[in-house]
């Protein structure tokens, strides 16, 4: 076993009963068999579903982990991992298969940390967003020649340059006024993107994701938004300008969580390049347009970072175990970050759930909205904040909230109908695309957690 920092020892000790896994590259059929194997081993906490097909008809499979798979539980956050967006960048794909087996085995072994994670979180794992590109790259195998072979999808399109460009609209709105969140898509967006991109967009619109990471290769660094430079400068021998989001401090913290839990990312010097703390603003490294992490932030409630995980885009099979051991703790710690900040229900005077209510934090020019079940999640660093909830036809309500370092603060909002507006209220429907609705659990565990972290109503 490679030498690893002492911080890895607790998780390694908890993992002594894990069934040995094979560290090898998985072609498409093998990937599907592996996902089904994990699902069959842990049917009570997993669901295997697909979000669409690739250009060549391969399914984009997602493995979900939850104590109620297929169900959104109000106040339980949704988090996702996406791998293999570029077909020739394969480490993320293999890490996510390893992570899936690890979560299943550790749950069966009653690892308390993993039990708590799966009981309190709905986790979605998409190992390969670009299975067609992967098959092209895998036919070549680990080889430094043909560096970009298989990067694009079967239509020759780079999927990380294929999302609707919402940055331009946001930069304009920031200067002249306009929405700072959930920017609308053009009417013809479906005809402008590839099948894989369309599938992912429909997926992230159907579930209220809170946190995400997108895995790449060719460097070792945690990259956070924005990817597109305000100055519209693109990759050159010199770094472009930093383009921070309104949540820049939070994004830097999320990136550092992964970097410092990783075996060597935090050291900075990797792959012949240097990134302080092992993190970088995307545009500060090089500017790209129509990327996925910026799209998540500007169109949904989801905060996504991009993880560059290996110097070699297609590492040799013999390197996979070392890479897994170097990333395992970071993968778990990043998932746990979804449980910070504030969350709660937005209700009307009759205790009906309100969907689409806007949650604003004074001093941070980026809002989130309540989901279809009336619950909202707002990632925040520890501190004291002024938070406002507002919905059409209702009087806004503002409270002062203190966020601590251990777990989210629960803050519910009950809004009174406005006496000056007569707009109809939009109530949360009972069911949403891709999942069943479930009433909030009243278990002692969640009641006690709510009491510990409840903020002002």
From Swiss-Prot:
It is found in: Secreted, Extracellular space. It is an enzyme of class 3 (hydrolase). The keyword Hydrolase applies. Keywords: Carboxypeptidase, Disulfide bond, Glycoprotein, Hydrolase, Metal-binding, Metalloprotease, Protease, Secreted, Signal, Zinc. Disulfide bonds join 42-104, 271-311. Plasma. Expressed in liver. Residues 1-23 form the signal peptide. Residues 418-457 are annotated as: Disordered. The active site is at residue 308. One of its GO terms (molecular function) is carboxypeptidase activity. It catalyses: Release of a C-terminal basic amino acid, preferentially lysine. Residues 24-338 form the Peptidase M14 domain. Belongs to the peptidase M14 family. Tetramer of two catalytic chains and two glycosylated inactive chains. This is Carboxypeptidase N catalytic chain. It comes from Rattus norvegicus.
């Amino acid at each position: 076993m490679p030498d690893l920092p002492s911080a890895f020892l607790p998780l390694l000790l908890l993992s002594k009963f894990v069934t040995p896994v094979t560290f090898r590259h998985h072609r498409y059929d093998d990937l599907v068999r592996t996902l089904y194997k994990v699902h069959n081993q842990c049917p009570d906490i997993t669901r295997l579903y697909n979000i669409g097909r690739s250009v060549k008809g391969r399914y984009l499979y997602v493995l979900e982990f939850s104590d109620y798979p297929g169900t959104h539980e109000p106040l339980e956050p949704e988090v996702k991992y996406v791998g293999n967006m570029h077909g020739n960048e394969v480490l993320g794909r293999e890490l996510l298969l390893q992570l899936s087996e690890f979560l299943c085995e550790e749950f069966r072994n009653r690892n308390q940390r993993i039990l708590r994670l799966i009981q309190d979180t709905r986790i979605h794992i998409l190992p390969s967003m670009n299975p067609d590109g992967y098959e092209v790259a895998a036919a070549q195998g680990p080889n430094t020649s043909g560096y970009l072979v298989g990067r694009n999808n079967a239509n020759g399109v780079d999927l990380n340059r294929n999302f609707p460009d919402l940055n331009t609209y946001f930069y304009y709105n920031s200067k002249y006024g306009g929405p700072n969140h959930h920017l609308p898509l053009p009417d013809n967006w479906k005809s402008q993107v590839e099948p894989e991109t369309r599938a992912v967009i429909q997926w992230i619109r159907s579930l209220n994701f809170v946190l995400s990471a997108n895995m790449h290769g060719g460097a070792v660094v945690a990259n956070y938004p924005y990817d597109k430079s305000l100055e519209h400068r693109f990759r050159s021998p010199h770094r472009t300008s930093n383009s921070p989001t309104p949540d820049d401090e939070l994004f830097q913290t999320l990136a550092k969580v992964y970097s410092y839990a990783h075996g060597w990312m935090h050291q900075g010097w990797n792959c012949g390049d240097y990134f302080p703390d092992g993190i970088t603003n995307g545009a500060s490294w090089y500017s790209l347009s129509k990327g996925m992490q910026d799209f998540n932030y500007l169109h949904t409630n989801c905060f996504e970072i991009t993880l560059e995980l290996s110097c070699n885009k297609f590492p040799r099979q013999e390197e996979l175990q070392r890479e897994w051991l170097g990333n395992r703790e970071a993968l778990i710690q990043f998932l746990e970050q979804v449980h910070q900040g504030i969350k709660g229900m937005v209700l009307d005077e009759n205790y009906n759930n309100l969907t689409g209510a806007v949650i604003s934090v004074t001093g941070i020019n980026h809002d989130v909205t309540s989901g279809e079940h009336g619950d909202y999640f707002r990632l925040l660093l520890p501190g004291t904040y002024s938070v406002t909830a507002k919905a059409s036809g209702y009087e806004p309500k503002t409270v002062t909230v203190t966020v601590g370092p251990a777990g989210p603060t629960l803050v519910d909002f009950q809004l009174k109908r406005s006496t000056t507006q007569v707009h109809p209220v939009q109530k949360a429907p009972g069911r949403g695309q891709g999942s069943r609705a479930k009433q909030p659990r009243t278990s002692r565990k969640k009641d006690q957690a709510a009491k510990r972290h409840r903020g002002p109503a």
